[in-house]
Amino acid sequence: MLIDTALEAHYAERDENVRLTSTVKGQFELARMQHLLGQYLPDPPAVVGDIGGGPGTHARWLRDRGYSVELLDPIPHHVAQARAAGIDACVGDARKLPWEDEYFDAVLMAGPLYHLTCLEDRLTALQEATRVTRPGGFVAVVALNRTANLIGALLANELQQRQPVVQEILDTGFSPANDRMAETTYHTVSQLRQEMSGHGLRSITVHGLTGPGGWLTVALDAHFHHQQPPATLTDPDPLQTALTCSRIADRFPELLPASSQFFAVGQRA
């Protein structure tokens, strides 16, 4: 089985194709991803693997910048959407990639690491991503912060209802009762560094993908997604405020745990 049935149902209920464009939080996350990818990708033309690339949001951006992109995702509907957008895409498993050794100049793995709840599976996926990357190329992964549910529930004023789930995720990194995203594991910074190490990757660097600025966008979407926010939350543009905040925070490693998502990068030895 490529994907857990609960996770498949989760994505069947949501249009992943518009997730990063239909909300302030999504637009913010997309802008941050593009900013961080730009720091590590080789100049185009180059061949980039998008592992767990969903319907191809990142792949389309990479293609439009001049990269050759090949996408893999376990959900056939996502692969069909990516193909419809002109992306070379296939159904597959991050733990058993179909490409030969040293095939890509760089690899992005934005989904599999947090949807593989077994440590052995995550390590296998990292080994596979490293295997298909050429020496000197970067492997970039996205992970979710264990504290994200605590702060997110606080800002949405839902902590009292969600406290058991939040506490379990803080304690173990996983909760089978997590109703927000099925079959999802959450990392600490040190845990993510440890999992990234030992696969032929060097110079492991962890960034705050969303940084502290992301929490402004979470609050906006939680309370004003279907209505107009007050003027104090629209002028100046809150998206630009959030981006400015997180770019400032990038210079301070001690602020890394304030990010709801992590962007970790290692270079193939």
Protein language model features and the residues they cover:
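Conserved class I S-adenosyl-L-methionine
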Residues: 1-44, 57, 81, 138-169
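Class I SAM-dependent methyltransferase SAM/SAH-binding core
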Residues: 49, 55-96
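A short acidic, Gly/Pro-enriched loop at the edge of an enzyme's catalytic core
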Residues: 95-107
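A short SAM/SAH-binding and catalytic strip from SAM-dependent methyltransferases
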Residues: 106-120
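A short glycine-rich, Lys/Arg-flanked "PGG" loop and its adjoining helix->strand segment in the class I
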Residues: 123-138
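Short alpha-helix
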Residues: 183-200, 206
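C-terminal helical/coil "lid" or tail adjacent to the Rossmann-like core of SAM-dependent
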Residues: 204-253
